[in-house]
Curated annotation (Swiss-Prot):
Family: Belongs to the CpcE/RpcE/PecE family.
Cystine pairings recorded for this chain: none
Organism for this UniProt entry: Synechococcus sp. (strain WH8020)
Any single Gene Ontology cellular-component annotation: phycobilisome
Name of the protein: Bilin biosynthesis protein MpeU
InterPro entries on file: ARM-like (IPR011989), ARM-type_fold (IPR016024), PBS_lyase_HEAT (IPR004155)
Keyword list, A-Z: Antenna complex, Phycobilisome
Keyword Metal-binding in record: no
Entries under SMART domains matching the protein: EZ_HEAT
Purpose of the protein: An enzyme involved in the biosynthesis of bilin.
The organism's place on the tree of life at top rank: Bacteria
Keyword Transcription regulation among UniProt keywords: no
Any one GO MF annotation of this record: oxidoreductase activity
Length: 297
């Protein structure tokens, strides 16, 4: 972060005329087609970043691909543009180009843009770039998620990013699952949910099943839903049976719904017993529906 900031002091984003942008893009496109790398000196990179503000989408794509092929050397100028350019098109394209590069050196600047830039496309592209960076982005994304000023739009973007990261390296969420903050634990579970549905990764399943015993009822309730969506009766039914006796109404309800979802016919007797002991009429109604549905199988 320090290295990028120190370099940014000498960076000044140029501007290109329509003719200059077209001429440069044509030359860059030819280099790319021949498998050649563009010049990576400061002046050349500066001109390419300036080209990201062109109103012609095809030209912007050529500049982005060229900067992406340069890689790490382009990060300082792209980060400067992302932070300080008054041209929203350049900020958007800079975030998208940092996504192409996918280097964690850009992470502090992407976090800042995600939190402070008011443009939704910049926020979305910054989140996408963090998702591409992967595991190093998990902690800052979860931190933002727990802040009171995190918007509903940002929450959606973060959940998408975390889900993508989870699909690539689910065990990177180990520390998040053990966080002291229940909101972070829930976010980590949701990020693992899709991965659990797509594969039979025993380590991922173990993390989710262990969350059924979490001290926070909201975490247990969320884990119960995920188990129902991602596991069969042999893998998760017995653990859900314990939650039919949970002290929290929502947890008991979710456990019954998940047993129905996984078609756990081995759970009919457990649901019968839970129905007889249930004092909440709404929860009892859900349990009865779940039992009756299972009896049809």
């Amino acid at each position: 972060m320090t290295g990028i900031n120190s370099q940014q002091e000498d960076i000044k984003i140029e501007t290109l005329t329509q003719e200059e942008a077209l001429e440069l893009a044509t030359a860059l496109k030819q280099k790319l087609s021949h498998g050649e790398l563009p010049n990576s000196d400061l002046e050349s990179i500066n001109k390419m970043v300036a080209g990201l503000g062109d109103n012609r989408g095809e030209l912007r794509l050529t500049f982005a691909k060229s900067l992406g092929s340069i890689g790490e050397d382009a990060i300082p100028i792209l980060c400067e543009a992302l932070k300080n350019s008054s041209n929203v098109v350049i900020r958007r394209a800079s975030a998208k180009t940092l996504n192409i590069i996918g280097n964690k050196k850009a992470l502090p600047n992407l976090i800042e843009a995600f939190e402070s830039d008011e443009d939704p496309v910049v926020q979305g592209s910054s989140a996408g770039a963090m998702a591409t960076i992967g595991e190093p982005a998990i902690e800052p994304l979860l931190r933002i998620l727990t802040e009171s000023n995190c918007t509903a739009f940002q929450i959606g973007l973060i959940n998408l990013a975390l889900g993508f990261i989870g699909s690539k390296g689910p065990m990177g969420f180990n520390s998040a699952i053990s966080s002291k903050n229940p909101e972070i634990r829930i976010a980590a579970l949701n990020a693992l949910a899709e991965q659990a549905q797509k594969s039979e990764n025993k380590d991922v399943q173990a993390l989710i099943l262990n969350a059924l015993k979490d001290q926070d009822s909201e975490v247990r309730a969320e884990a119960a839903i995920i188990v129902g969506k991602s596991m069969d009766q042999e893998e998760g039914a017995h653990q859900l049976h314990e939650l039919l006796k949970d002290k929290n109404d929502q947890v008991r309800k979710n456990a019954a719904l998940s047993l129905m979802k996984m078609e756990a016919v081995i759970s009919i007797d457990f649901l019968d017993r839970a129905i007889r002991q249930e004092s909440d009429e709404q929860v009892k109604g859900v349990m009865i529906v779940a039992r009756n549905q299972l009896m049809k199988h």
